[in-house]
Amino acid sequence: MHSNKFRDPLISRAQPVTIITPIVDETLRMAGVSAVREEILDRFMNGQPRIAVVHGGDDHPPNVGSKETIRRMIRQIWANGGIPFEVSQSAPCEELSYGTEGMNYALLARNFCTASLASHIELHGYDAAVVFGVCDKMMVGSLRALIEADLAHQRRKARPVFATLIPSLIGREIRVMDDDRRKFEPLRHRLNETERAELDQLFHRPMKPHVYAQVKALLDRCFHRRIVQEGEKDDLERSIAKCSSVPGANCGASEASMVHRMVLASFGIVPRNLDISMKPPDDQQLSEVVKRLIQAIQKRERRVSVASLTRYNLTNAAAVWSATGGHPAWLLHLTYLADAIGKKLSIEDISKKTLKVPQILAIDDAAGNSVYSMAVENQNGGNSGIDTIMRTLAEKRLIEDRAPTLDGSWMQRIMEARSANGNFVYSTMTPFLPTCGMLGMHGNMCSAAIARLAPQNRNGIIQRFDRKIHLAIYYLGQKELQADLATLDGVLERLKRKVSREDLYYTWLLNWHSNSGNGAPPDLSEWNKAKLWTYLLSNKLLRAMIVVAGAGPHASGMPELQLALNASSHPLSGMCVLVTDGRVSFQHDGISIAHIVPEALDGGGLAAIRTADWIYLDLTHGEFQVVTQTPRGYKVLGAKELASRPDCKKRINELERRRLDLLPSFRILLDQVSSAEAGVSPTAKTN
């Protein structure tokens, strides 16, 4: 019975069959299949394909509503002659961690996910996997795990590993009910015109976590100003929270999730017509997916193994990343996957795609172009999801259409795809935006970084920040920033305490005096600090950089920062640039500079900046420099001079001490990953 002809130690050895048979029996029973144990034995000993069905745990938001589809997939694998194994492979939800110590663990959970699933596949000997989900950390981590296992199989001349990814369903969006809207009428009459407009704009959007968070932030500001009492505030928050607490509001239906779906699909491993789904796939669709996987396993189609598809489609994925809006997380994910297949690809290489590939996908809840609306159009035949995007890019030869997918080459697929109609997907001739807003940066504090301009900052507003001197507001670690964000005007007060009257006056003089527009500017030369501060704030002339050091991958795992939810009476994104060696949220609506290399812990110049330092920003040439005042204006500080500041060593020592507060099992990984430039990938520490 234990034949050696399959060259499979799980078959030739005695123990595996006795362990695996009851596992498969239980998996089938839970899926509603009354399997015969003898048939499980026969399939296992005859080398039938072993296919893992990988999904998130019960506490994983994108997994909501997927249980029945997972059971049907298990039934289809069994019905088509395979052996199904259910694998729960979850990743923590980053949305839950904002503002907490858990922020530090979100990105590297991707790496732990990779290690866990890769070892799982190697130990259990799976031939293929069907992965359900849409969380970028879980899906990218799982994809790299499958790549690593595939390459390991190929090195020992075993069967390649195959995979398909099935993104989570897009739930129905919910808008605020009329009854709940009416509860806000008494408060609405007490708000100023700007806040009324903000509230109306929020109520026109689908109720999702970030919308509820913005409503709560507005109510918090009103409470601080005593416009609303605590009891009334609690009732209003409860009414909106009920609208937002639905499956259609989770991360599976977020604007970011559409980018994740499209980039994952661009690798050719998402089945056709399943990249944007409102309804669960039917049994015929699932059966076709399973049959294709089993065919690839039995024929050993090395060209469509998971590692091969990733290698063939990596440059296509970079083009789709730019075309769908340039989500900053994928700068790290694409380099992480490139590292897995042994391909050299840096963040700078990916960002160059933005010079050639315009943004052609328009997803914006505020404008009515929601993810759910696009899913409705897709279901009604208005677009073909990733196939429409690939067809549009292929028209200008921005992708390699000869690259393979599990369902044939892109050239074959796009022949049947719908053309861009300008509702969600635009033509490259008339793109939604000429660029996705990502720029490579450098300066005396770093060798490389990435600037991102939110869509609302790409049409003229950028001139308010470009070629201006900004006053630094320095934080060592995200914990200090979170404390100030929770305090009314805490961030601005931090600058106000440190900045001098001369700093305010001369930065205003250099930034605005020559661009006064109509009429002569007021004479500020005799004004005191308090009067200058009030004038600059009220006229939106203050320019600052919120610098958060110690958020890099080696210092704290590269947490994701955002300024949207703060207690400031002045919108920070309208006057501040966010700078960090960590990550910045996709929802950030201002200008940000992130992924700074080298990070502060590694001796980067970011560790030496002080609050009230002058930083000159030149987005046109991709530069930002710490400068000092001179009689003729300012001069750029030398990189060595900046790094030699005494603050630098003290802060590095403090960051080393803070690392001891992280979880021990997490802390050991920090020294074993690369910098942000290489995707925070596994690396051997060399002495």
How should these model regions be labeled?
Residues 87-124:
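N-terminal small/polar loop signature for handling phosphorylated ligands or for N-terminal nucleophile
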Residues 112-126, 607-619:
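Extended, charge-rich low-complexity interaction segments
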Residues 53, 124-142, 163:
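A short, small-residue-rich loop immediately preceding and capping a beta-strand
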Residues 75, 92-97, 375, 383:
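Glycine-rich nucleotide/cofactor/substrate-binding loop typically near the N-terminus or early
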Residues 87, 132-133, 164, 579:
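Structural motif
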Residues 158-160, 575-577:
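Proline-centered loop/turn at the N-terminus of a beta-strand
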Residues 65-87:
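Low-complexity, highly charged intrinsically disordered N-terminal segments
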Residues 1-59, 80-82, 88, 102, ...:
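Catalytic or ion-coupling anion/metal-binding cores of large enzyme and transporter domains
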